[in-house]
Amino acid sequence: MVFSCNSMEDLEQNWRKLSLSEREGPGCSLTKDDGVQAFSIAAKFFTKRALSIDVIAKTFTPLWRSRNGFKIKSLGDHKVLFTFDDKNDVDRILMSEPWSFDKHLVAMERYEKETPLHELKFEKTSLWVQIHGIPLRYMTVAVVEKICEVISDVLHLKDPKDADGGSVLRLKISIDMSLPLCRGWLVTLENDKQVWVSFKYERLPNLCYWCGHLTHVDKDCAIWIESEGTLRTDERQFGPSLRAPAFVLSRKDVIMVPGFYTDKKKAGPSNPSHKAMA
């Protein structure tokens, strides 16, 4: 059989088509103990500028504040591998997404050592989305989750209080980057009245206002390029309104006041001895 291979990646993907010799395997098995105990994040940088791992280190060191530091390895094609010796660092960094560099998105994945690096797709990223315009009677975390589950994977919060901003609720969602950001949702209430619920995203990096994708900016969009500059900016379907205002966790703005006679009933009847003394 004649087999042509243009790259090492082709060979890795098509080895099943080869007739392997005795020296080529199978025969070598690797166990968990053979691997290095480390925890990694693979990242893809969507900036068009050339990457410098020194600048990356200078940018993220004060933001991540890793106690034991971390290692950065360039993988080419604007991809980088961050390696830590503490799993808690990886968990904390991924929980704090989204991250940006040069104002452009940095898509991150927890890297498992069993996965070949070229198989990483960087198809999703996590964002905090604020939900605006929900009628007051429907302002619950359960309702917000129901709305968001239609358009994304909801990352359920450990503490529901993290979702409460008083007049607005928010959730952490995982979005498919091959799709445009969702601007909102037309919700039908039980009386058949329709209301528009707006989505606003926290710490949103640069995005394309023509198509709503996070992977490029306006000047690199196919819609703009194909128009040969004939489109007007007021024809853009997306805009700064997607950016959320600063989120402030709700303080204790609501308290439950017991009925007027509740405390009196708990206290019981007046002491008769006091009446006698009077």
Whereabouts are the PLM-identified features?
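Long, low-complexity intrinsically disordered regions
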Residues: 1-68, 165, 183-278
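Nucleic acid-contacting regions in RNA/DNA-associated proteins
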Residues: 1-128, 133-140, 157-160, 185
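The conserved glycine-aromatic submotif of the RRM
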Residues: 75-83, 163-172, 205
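Classical protein tyrosine phosphatase
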Residues: 88, 92, 139-154, 216-222
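Well-ordered beta-strand positions in beta-sheet-rich domains
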Residues: 105, 128, 170-172, 184-186, ...
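Short, structured patches in soluble enzyme cores that scaffold and shape functional sites
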Residues: 131-133, 175-177, 201-203, 212
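BRCT (BRCA1 C-terminal) domain core and associated BRCT-interaction motifs
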Residues: 158-182
